[in-house]
Structure formats: C-alpha cells, structure tokens
C-alpha cells in the first residue's frame, strides 16, 4: 500500500449547501488525513490556469464561471492509495450515474455542479497540489 497525496476541491455548490463537515467526515472516515486546507474565492485567472487542460473543450467557460461563482475549499488529502480512495468517495462525475452513498450522489445537483474535484492520477495530483499549496504549507501528520 502506497501513502499518496491528492488534491480535493469542495466546489461552490457544496460550500453553499453547508455540507463541508459532512464531506470532511467522509474523507476522515475513509482513513484520509487533511494535511493542508484553505477556503478561497478563486479568481478567473486561477480557475482558468487550474483547468487549462480543458481550455479547448466546449464546457471550459461554463466550468470556469461555475468555479468562480462562490467560495471553494481546497485541501490536500493523504493516506494509503489516497487518489483512488478519494475518487471512490466522490463517485461518478455525473451524479445521476454515481453510486448511492458517494459524495456526488448525495450532494451534487448536476454534471456541472457536481460538488467536488479530485486528482485523477499521481502525476496530476503533484501538479494540482503544487498549483495551490507551496510545499512548505503541507504538513504530514
């Protein structure tokens, strides 16, 4: 079992629903530790930079507009197989297709307002974590 880190974002829709604590409980209940966290209002430039990989996709503008529509909570999760564990907790991108009991099935409204973001691979996680958290702001526990 590998100890990994992954980036997690609680998106504006879930922050507005006041389910941050419930989502954090799921992370911790699955054995994931929160080793860095902050609440922020993303600027357009931050959101465009973070999602630059999708810049040519038709949904890019709507995604950026959504991500800057309200505050988000950005955290780094650490634990055994953290990336896949976090993705399992999140559920499918489309909440209608997400398994019952996943974060998206329970808290998301649509494929766009889908409550959470999570890194999809180890290399992606490293890049995403570095984007929001300089190394000196992440603390192993």
From Swiss-Prot:
It is found in: Cytoplasm. It holds the Pfam family NDK. The keyword Signal does not apply. It catalyses: a 2'-deoxyribonucleoside 5'-diphosphate + ATP = a 2'-deoxyribonucleoside 5'-triphosphate + ADP; a ribonucleoside 5'-diphosphate + ATP = a ribonucleoside 5'-triphosphate + ADP. InterPro entries: NDK-like_dom (IPR034907), NDK-like_dom_sf (IPR036850), Nucleoside_diP_kinase (IPR001564), Nucleoside_diP_kinase_AS (IPR023005). The keyword Transferase applies. Keywords: ATP-binding, Cytoplasm, Kinase, Magnesium, Metal-binding, Nucleotide metabolism, Nucleotide-binding, Phosphoprotein, Transferase. Its cofactor is Mg(2+). GO terms for molecular function: ATP binding; metal ion binding; nucleoside diphosphate kinase activity. The active site is at 117 (pros-phosphohistidine intermediate). This is Nucleoside diphosphate kinase. It comes from Janthinobacterium sp. (strain Marseille) (Minibacterium massiliensis).
